């Protein structure tokens, strides 16, 4: 095309320069000025990488003065264009705008504009964009969205609770599973769903101080949720950045002590507009009707301000009725306002539980029993279902299940309380204790004697703590460099045990980090034993590396030496041998230690080895834990209660372990108390609640469907393609692991989620569970979500041109592949994507407007096409521009029908589902007061807003590909 002064052109290679103007032309070169950047470019006339900018009738253009005009006619005179049309601001018609006065800051965002302006993408980017649209739309429609992305085993009861609660509006529930059943994971799953769907954006987690890092690690490692830890220092820093320091972060963890210590701080927390509040160890919030504790009042104040509340607590049976009522009162003070009334209500649930047991037993029901069930459910048309349940037909079982669901919906606290017990959940290993009694070395005997004389004024508790760790008493006198490990028989025993069990992974836990470090040195220097160390002085990354080394099967560490605090929140269920080098001070810590291995999914029985020194507090404690509480070989829900009741007596025996008079009686009393309390807990078990919390076959089916999704090969292919196009290096490390590192030619200089040093990823859930240094990649992982955003929020792949070698079609035959997106705009919390996610509609049109998309599948067609370089592509586009315009108009006429069908289907689905949920809850409200008014109001409001948003839904062209047939 000839160049003329004043013409407007755009650079094919530097589109960011905007619109250029021809300012000089000679026989061989042309010079363009780009006014928006003030830069000049000199090109060869014969082969310049620039494209002539020509607008068509119907386009909207902007003048350099900022006003806009709709083009109605285009005139050309001496190679220069003049556009004639109507100004949009003044509605003046017949206005002429010469091309030299076009706005230079021109950005082509519509696919067709980019194509005609020569901004042609690589063919593989177009394919990636379409796949991104397709897979993204499919993922939103998955019924278990938000439950697949976490690095956890697929345990049915956890998935059941998370699926139920995570989909509610502002859930307010009590999670009261027995220890080891994964309350933290359930809470994390609920958070993950709520954050992913947009139902929540700001979350506050309040935990005891010692558990802050555990939660921080769990949320990051398992759910890719990056929380900020607020303490006094962080709070003071944040005060410089915002009036309310908590407004500086969306996801916050702080301790209960931190929250209640300062009145101003608590006010700031209450004013920070959280969507969800999570409180761990909520059973420690002391309450009585007359004197609630300050901690309880602080949480009560917060719970009044935050719409969603999750309380993690001990089981109701352990808490006692009053304490259990106090937790429920935090969730719904209007419903749970009278303790006496609550006690009476609980008694009335017994017949319901009996009715459920009766239905599940499968026996024929008498007429009286059928009548009782009918009255309890209170539905007018319940008779056919009752008859079906009592028949011999194939439908009897499903009818009984439906009746059980109806009963559970209508009675009890099942909407606000979830509690699973080990009795009701399969998959736990046995625990076997091996105690090793060892002589007390003379060096320790001397140190203990001297310490007793010098510390005569110490309290019994301090002396008891000292006596648990004789090596520390010895070091106090001999200095930190004292080589206690040279004579401590526990060290000798440990080395012997490890060398004779070389093939076993062994977890060794001791109270202090210093002990772990000293043991590592001894094992390495004396026996060449590979041991990783894990303690609170290490960063999270260092701990990850240590855990990963321990997890490696062949070349990894045989031993992981953990300190008490360092191992919090970490699970190593691939190991089944544990050595307690010393013993913790209370039963909760003991259970926490064993809980590192005793998890659902543990494949072997757990071997617990306790080498202890006679005539020390260890020998007292090992007997009390084992004979008094049976705490080594079984979980001990009674431990804390008994510990508190015999504390003073126990402390005296620990402080003076040589004075054992009456100790046998103490153990006997504790065992009797333990058995009585256990029987009491068992009797008080709420079977109705157990059935509801467990989820039964429904939960099993949910786990299986997610497991099937884990094997989705589309994800792996898409992710690799995505990483290639973004410019991320991939290095296959074997064992289903890949290392990703940034390259020098990335689409964006800093890709979120990819550190400078790179990351290790896996698509295999089992590998991710065993290797904490490998990130588990699913459709829900931030790396994939950020990649989808990067591709879909920009114009990557939105316009391209390809050649189709097909001798059955005439040379030069034109096809245009159009990707439309049907979507509705709405606030994220409406979760409109459940019904109408941005949905791609593909068309493949010929010159006559025939849509061949149904006959020609995308991937098959894509494999038949060949790429065209940008320069040749620009020439092709210019040659067929008028034809492409005509095909685009035919596409616009056809998309309306397809889009309307999608929108109508979404409206019907939304109306049906949301109306049904509202009707169900309104019906239940009459018989179950645990359904909150605000929940009903929210569902009705949500339904109205969803329907209004769907009424406003529309469509747009997202990408197009021009295909030209060739025979070469």
Swiss-Prot record:
From which domain of life does this come? Bacteria
Q: Which UniProt keywords apply?
A: Activator, ATP-binding, DNA-binding, Helicase, Hydrolase, Nucleotide-binding, Transcription, Transcription regulation
For the motif DEAH box, give the residue ranges.
280-283
What does the record give as EC number? 3.6.4.-
Q: Which InterPro entries match?
A: Helicase_ATP-bd, Helicase_C-like, Helicase_RapA, P-loop_NTPase, RapA_C, SNF2-like_sf, SNF2/RAD54-like_C, SNF2_N
Keyword check for Nucleotide-binding, yes or no: yes
Listed binding positions for ATP are: 177-184
CDD domains on file? DEXDc_RapA, SF2_C_SNF
Q: Which biological process annotations from GO are given for this protein?
A: regulation of DNA-templated transcription
Q: Where is the Helicase C-terminal domain?
A: 490-662
Q: Which residues form the Helicase ATP-binding domain?
A: 164-334
Drop me one GO molecular function for this one. Answer: hydrolase activity, acting on acid anhydrides
Please state which protein family the record places this protein in: Belongs to the SNF2/RAD54 helicase family. RapA subfamily.
What does the record give as the function of this protein?
Answer: Transcription regulator that activates transcription by stimulating RNA polymerase (RNAP) recycling in case of stress conditions such as supercoiled DNA or high salt concentrations. Probably acts by releasing the RNAP, when it is trapped or immobilized on tightly supercoiled DNA. Does not activate transcription on linear DNA. Probably not involved in DNA repair.
**Quaternary structure per UniProt?**
Interacts with the RNAP. Has a higher affinity for the core RNAP than for the holoenzyme. Its ATPase activity is stimulated by binding to RNAP.
Q: Which PANTHER family match?
A: DNA ANNEALING HELICASE AND ENDONUCLEASE ZRANB3 FAMILY MEMBER, SWI_SNF-RELATED MATRIX-ASSOCIATED ACTIN-DEPENDENT REGULATOR OF CHROMATIN SUBFAMILY A-LIKE PROTEIN 1
- Tell me the protein's name: RNA polymerase-associated protein RapA
Origin species: Escherichia coli O9:H4 (strain HS)
Q: Which gene encodes it?
A: rapA
């Amino acid at each position: 095309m000839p160049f003329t002064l004043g013409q407007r052109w755009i650079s094919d290679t530097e589109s960011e320069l905007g619109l250029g103007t021809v300012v000089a032309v000679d026989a061989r070169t042309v010079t363009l000025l780009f006014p928006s950047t003030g830069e000049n470019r000199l090109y060869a006339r014969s082969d310049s990488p620039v494209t002539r900018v020509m607008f068509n009738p119907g386009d909207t253009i902007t003048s350099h003065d900022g006003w806009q005009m709709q083009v109605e006619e285009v005139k050309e005179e001496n190679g220069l264009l003049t556009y004639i049309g109507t100004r949009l601001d003044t509605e003046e018609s017949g206005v002429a705008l010469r091309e030299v006065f076009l706005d230079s800051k021109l950005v082509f965002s519509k696919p067709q504009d980019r194509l005609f302006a020569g901004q042609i993408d690589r063919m593989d980017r177009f394919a990636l964009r379409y796949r991104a649209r397709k897979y993204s739309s499919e993922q939103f429609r998955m019924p278990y969205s938000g439950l697949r992305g976490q690095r956890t085993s697929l345990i049915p009861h956890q998935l059941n609770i998370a699926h139920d609660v995570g989909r509610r509006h502002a859930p307010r529930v009590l999670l009261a599973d027995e220890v080891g059943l994964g309350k933290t994971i359930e809470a994390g799953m609920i958070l993950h769903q709520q954050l992913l769907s947009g139902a929540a954006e700001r979350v506050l987690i309040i935990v005891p101080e010692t558990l802050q890092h555990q939660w921080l690690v769990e949320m990051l490692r398992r759910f890719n949720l990056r929380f900020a830890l607020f303490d006094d220092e962080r709070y003071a820093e944040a005060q410089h950045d915002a009036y309310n320091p908590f407004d500086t972060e969306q996801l916050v963890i702080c301790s209960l002590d931190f929250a209640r210590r300062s009145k101003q701080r608590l006010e700031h927390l209450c004013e920070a507009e959280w969507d969800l509040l999570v409180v761990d160890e909520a059973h420690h919030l002391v309450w009585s009707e007359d004197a609630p504790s300050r901690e309880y009042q602080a949480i009560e104040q917060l719970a009044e301000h935050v719409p969603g509340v999750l309380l993690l607590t001990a089981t109701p049976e352990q808490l006692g009725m009053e304490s259990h009522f106090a937790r429920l009162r935090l969730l719904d003070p209007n419903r749970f306002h009278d303790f006496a009334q609550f006690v009476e209500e609980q008694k009335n649930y017994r017949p319901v539980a009996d009715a459920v047991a009766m239905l599940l037993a499968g026996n024929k029901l008498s007429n009286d029993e059928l009548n009782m069930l009918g009255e309890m459910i209170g539905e007018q048309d319940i008779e056919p279902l009752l008859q079906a349940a009592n028949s011999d037909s194939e439908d009897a079982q499903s009818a009984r299940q439906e009746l059980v669901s109806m009963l559970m919906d209508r009675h009890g606290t099942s909407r606000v309380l979830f509690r699973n017990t080990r009795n009701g959940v399969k998959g736990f290993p046995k625990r076997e204790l091996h105690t090793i009694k060892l002589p007390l070395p003379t060096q320790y005997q001397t140190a203990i004697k001297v310490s007793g004389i010098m510390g005569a004024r110490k309290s019994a508790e301090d002396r008891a703590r000292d006596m648990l760790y004789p090596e520390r008493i010895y070091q106090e006198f001999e200095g930190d460099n004292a080589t206690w490990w040279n004579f401590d028989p526990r060290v000798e025993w440990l080395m012997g045990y490890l060398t004779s069990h070389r093939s076993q992974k062994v977890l060794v836990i001791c109270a202090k980090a210093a002990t772990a470090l000293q043991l590592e040195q001894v094992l390495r220097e004396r026996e060449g034993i590979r041991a990783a160390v894990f303690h609170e002085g290490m960063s999270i990354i260092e701990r990850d590396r240590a855990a990963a080394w321990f997890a490696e099967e062949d070349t990894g560490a045989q031993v992981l030496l953990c300190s008490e605090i360092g191992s919090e929140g970490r699970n190593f269920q691939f190991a089944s041998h544990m050595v307690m080098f010393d013993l913790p001070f209370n039963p909760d810590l003991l259970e926490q230690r064993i809980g590192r291995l005793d998890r659902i999914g543990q494949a072997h029985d757990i071997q617990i080895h306790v080498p202890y020194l006679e005539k020390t507090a260890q020998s007292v404690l090992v007997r009390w834990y084992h004979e008094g509480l049976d705490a080594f070989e079984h979980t001990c829900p009674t431990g804390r209660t008994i510990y508190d009741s015999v504390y003073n007596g126990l402390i005296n025996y620990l402080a003076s372990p040589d004075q054992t008079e009456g100790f046998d009686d103490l153990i006997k009393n504790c065992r009797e108390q333990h058995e009585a309390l256990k029987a009491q807990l068992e009797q008080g078990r709420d079977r109705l609640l157990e059935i509801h919390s467990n989820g039964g076959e429904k939960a099993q089916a949910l786990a299986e469907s997610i497991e099937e999704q884990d094997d989705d090969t589309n994800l792996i292919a898409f992710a690799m393609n995505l990483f290639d196009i973004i410019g991320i290096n991939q290095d296959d490390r074997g064992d289903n692991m890949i290392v990703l590192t940034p390259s020098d030619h990335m689409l964006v200089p800093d890709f979120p989620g990819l550190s400078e040093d790179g990351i290790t990823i896996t698509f295999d859930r089992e590998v991710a569970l065993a290797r904490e240094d490998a990130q588990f990649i699913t459709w829900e992982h931030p790396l994939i979500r950020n990649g989808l955003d990067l591709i879909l929020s920009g114009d990557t792949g939105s316009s391209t041109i390809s050649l189709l070698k097909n001798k059955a079609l005439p040379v030069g035959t034109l096809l245009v592949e159009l990707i439309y997106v049907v979507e509705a705009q709405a606030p994220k919390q409406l979760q409109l994507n459940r019904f109408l996610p941005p949905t791609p509609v593909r068309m493949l049109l010929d010159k006559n407007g025939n849509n061949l998309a149904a006959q020609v599948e995308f991937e098959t067609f894509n494999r038949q096409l060949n790429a065209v370089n940008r320069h040749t592509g620009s020439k092709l586009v210019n040659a067929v521009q008028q034809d492409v315009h005509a095909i685009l108009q035919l596409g616009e006429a056809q998309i309306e029908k397809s889009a309307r069908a999608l929108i109508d289907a979404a409206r019907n689905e939304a109306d049906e589902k949301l109306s049904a949920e509202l009707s169900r809850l309104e019906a239940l409200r009459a018989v179950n007061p645990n359904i909150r008014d605000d929940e009903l109001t929210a569902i009705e409001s949500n339904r109205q807003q969803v329907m209004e948003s769907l009424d406003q839904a529309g469509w747009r062209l997202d990408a197009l590909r021009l295909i030209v047939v060739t025979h070469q």
